Amino acid sequence: MVQLLSAFVSLLSVVAVSGAAIPAPAPEAVVDVAPETATIEPTGNFTAQACMYICGSVCYSSSAISAALNKGYSYYEDGATAGSSSYPHRYNNYEGFDFPTAKPWYEFPILSSGRVYTGGSPGADRVIFDSHGNLDMLITHNGASGNNFVACN
C-alpha cells in the first residue's frame, strides 16, 4: 500500500513539474428528442424541431404542418383533390370544436410518415383550415369513438 501511494505521489509531482494538463473527459452529448421530431440530414447533421401538435404518439413539427396545410389549401384553391381521394373536403365539425376562424372549414390528411398526402390511405390525422388557408387545428381519429375525431394536443 505504501508503494502504491508513493508511486501515485511521484506521478503527481511529474505532472505538476512538467506542466502537462490532464484533459478531463468530454461530457457525452445527451439528446432528448421527445417531444420533438429528429432527423439526421444527408450531411450527417442532427436536427430537431419541437412538436407543434401531438396526435396520439405522433409529433408534428411546424414545417410538417405547413407542408400539409399548404398542399391541402392548394388543392382547395384549384378545385382539385389529392389523387382519386376526396381530400380536401368540407369539415362539418360534428364534434363541436372551438375553431379560431369562421366556417367553412376543410380537412386534409397529415401523414405520420412525414410525407405530404397525394392520395391513397389518409391515415388518422388531419389538418383543419378555413377558406383563406388559415390553420385551425389538428385532429385525429385515434382515441375517438366510431368515425369521430378528437383534438390533438
From Swiss-Prot:
Give one GO term, molecular function aspect.
ribonuclease T1 activity
Sorted alphabetically, the keyword list is: Disulfide bond, Endonuclease, Hydrolase, Lyase, Nuclease, Signal
Which Pfam families did the record assign?
Answer: Ribonuclease (PF00545)
Reactions performed catalytically: [RNA] containing guanosine + H2O = an [RNA fragment]-3'-guanosine-3'-phosphate + a 5'-hydroxy-ribonucleotide-3'-[RNA fragment]
Please list the disulfide bridges.
C51-C59, C55-C152
User: Which residues form the pro-region?
Assistant: 21-49
EC assignment: the record states 4.6.1.24
Q: Where is the active site?
A: H89, E107 (proton acceptor), H141 (proton donor)
Q: Where is the signal peptide?
A: 1-20
Q: What family does this belong to?
A: Belongs to the ribonuclease N1/T1 family.
Which protein, by its recorded name, is this?
Answer: Guanyl-specific ribonuclease N1
